[in-house]
From Swiss-Prot:
Gene3D superfamilies: Sulfite Reductase Hemoprotein, domain 1 (3.30.413.10)
Keyword check for Transmembrane helix: no
Pathway: Sulfur metabolism; hydrogen sulfide biosynthesis; hydrogen sulfide from sulfite (NADPH route): step 1/1
Cofactor list: siroheme; [4Fe-4S] cluster
Protein name: Putative sulfite reductase [NADPH] hemoprotein beta-component
Length: 566
């Protein structure tokens, strides 16, 4: 008798009930918006606004307002939907203006989902945010919660004809998998409700069991960290054209401390497809996960757990059945790096791109750099695009020859072109405190200082020009992608972290825990020792992560289901 995996799980979670009863993500959000007494969204709406691209929290003001016996002052984070990470420079002017005038922090945050987000929007100005985005052709629908999130793309589609084709496929996939509900337009843009029944032919009435992430990648660069994502399309080319995709599925990095039923996992190969099958295969992968994914335990609801439960071959056969096709054998591909290439690049149409490093992706001005002001000046002059990268940096692209010198002068004078170490350029941190509701340890706010201390260690041993992929996450939810780093810190409690080592340079190996629940000072002592022996004993051009595996400092993670925790 054939097993029906859709019926394996019986009792659904609270989140499933919320989606079921939400009337296609409407809930009573409109009522909460009309309520001028409370600052936030209540009940089910607290969860539902995430489908509209927002998170709510008050943690940076909670203690102070509790002591003053005041009602919580909630503020929202809003994340834009920006498939492929591209935005016209002129549209940036509106984004900058909104951040300056309508957020508590006055900053813009680039994230590693290749888009930007605002922090500190009060409820009374939320509609203004959505209307502003709508005026420049953007929205925030589906950038959070149980849907296909922002689709990532290799960063610079202007670099070659292949990159331009990649760019077009990202748009097709993103639009194809977007929620069809009219709730977003009705609530945030005051669009009149039409007396028809909503339908979600791909996502379904209760949407997906958990968040779902997709990438489109042009080898040999893995800047999007494809192995961390649910569904990935690796471009295969012939005669300067994309002819098909290798399809990989089931990647993900979130864990729960101490819960051995959770584990990170690298995306695995399904097979090769020709271009005309792309959308039907994408739909079939998503709907298989929709129907078979775990809706009773959100900690085991991601695609990788579905594959582990039913087996890759069974999952693959179901996708082939739904798409009415058969996967071909994987085509050869390889990766050489995943970092951004900073500085000037000449594009195929003879204009220019300038990639600039943005520490932590945080766009603001301070006494050392005028990043926000500099980008604003460039946006006023520039006729091309800003392209956001999955490493939280910006590519100023399609720069005309006549503007190149002026843009370079602005970039230099505002600190956008500035020599920093390779270690710093390849570092990353999630937002964490004070605005992330899941944070349990510092991340973004300490990264720069921590990198300086590691830079000093590397200088001491004469290897200050070397690259180490170092990342910090304020909780084990995976946003900082620390579990694909050569050195990864994951917050365990305030001021304490688990230290993981042994990932590789291209992001295709999960690191192993080296020390648990230790302070920053203890971490630096351990790193001093490890970097010292690496500098002395490494083989020619041997990377740090490869060295600690070869030296048996930690065991290589081969199958994280069995050996990540052991």
């Amino acid at each position: 008798m054939k097993k029906d995996y859709k019926k394996v799980f019986l009792k659904n979670t609270k989140e499933e009930r919320i989606k079921e009863n939400s009337n296609y993500l409407r809930g009573t959000i409109i009522d909460d918006l009309k309520d001028e007494i409370t600052n936030g969204f209540t009940g089910d709406n607290f969860s539902l606004i995430r489908f509209h691209g927002m998170y709510q929290d008050d943690r940076d003001l909670r203690l102070e307002r509790n002591e003053q016996k005041l009602e919580p002052r909630y503020a929202m984070m809003l994340r834009c939907r920006l498939p492929r990470g591209i935005i016209k420079a002129k549209k940036w002017l509106k984004i900058d203006h909104f951040a300056s005038k309508n957020t508590l922090y006055g900053t813009i945050r680039l994230n590693n989902l290749q888009t930007f987000q605002f922090h500190g929007i009060l409820k009374k100005t939320l509609k203004d945010a959505h209307k502003m985005l709508n005026k420049i052709g953007l929205d925030s629908l589906g950038t959070a919660n149980d849907v296909n999130r922002n689709v990532l793309c290799t960063s610079n589609p202007m670099e070659s004809l292949i990159h331009q084709q990649c760019y077009e496929w990202v748009s097709k996939i993103s639009n194809f998998l977007l929620p069809q509900t009219k709730a977003y337009a009705e609530i945030w843009l005051n669009q009149k409700k039409i007396a028809t029944t909503d339908q979600e032919p791909i996502l379904g009435k209760t949407y997906l069991p958990r968040k779902f992430k997709t990438t489109v990648v042009v080898p040999p660069y893995n800047d999007v960290d494809l192995y961390a994502n649910d569904m990935n399309f690796i471009a295969i080319t012939k005669n300067n054209k994309i002819v098909g995709f290798n399809v990989l599925i089931g990647g993900g990095l979130s864990i729960n401390h101490g819960n051995k039923n959770t584990w990170p996992f690298l995306a695995v190969e399904l097979g090769y497809i020709t271009l005309e099958k792309t959308l039907s295969v994408a739909e079939s992968i998503v709907t298989t996960q929709r129907d078979w994914g775990n809706r009773t335990d959100r900690k085991n609801a991601k695609t990788r757990y579905t594959i582990a439960k039913v087996g890759l071959s069974v999952f693959k056969k179901e996708v082939e059945k739904r798409a009415n096709m058969t996967f071909e054998t994987i085509k050869p591909y390889y990766f050489i790096s995943r970092g951004d290439r900073f500085g000037w690049t000449k594009n195929i149409n003879n204009d220019w791109s300038l990639t600039v490093f943005i520490q932590n992706g945080r766009i603001y001005d301070n006494d050392k750099q005028l990043v926000k002001s500099g980008l604003l000046k460039i946006a006023n002059l520039h006729t091309g695009n800003f392209r956001l990268t999955a490493n939280q940096n910006i590519v100023i692209s399609e720069i005309l020859d006549k503007n190149k010198k002026k843009i370079e002068e602005i970039a230099i004078s505002h600190g956008l072109i500035k020599k920093v170490s390779s270690l710093r350029e390849n570092s990353m941190a999630c937002v964490s405190f004070p605005t992330c509701p899941l944070a349990i340890a510092e991340s973004e706010r300490i990264l720069s200082f921590f990198i300086t201390k590691v830079e000093n260690i590397m200088l001491k041993y004469g290897i200050e020009k070397e690259i180490i992929i170092l990342r910090i996450s304020g909780c084990p939810n995976g946003c900082g992608r620390s579990l694909l780093a050569e050195i990864g810190l994951i917050g365990k409690s305030l001021g304490r972290y688990n230290l993981y080592i042994g990932g590789n340079r291209i992001g295709s190996r999960i690191p192993k825990i080296y020390k648990e629940n230790i302070t920053e000072q203890e971490i630096l002592i351990h790193l001093d020792f490890l970097i010292k022996i690496w500098s002395i004993e490494r083989q020619k051009k041997e990377h740090f992560g490869d060295f600690v595996i070869r030296r048996n400092v930690v065991k290589k993670v081969v199958n994280p289901i069995y050996d990540f925790w052991n």
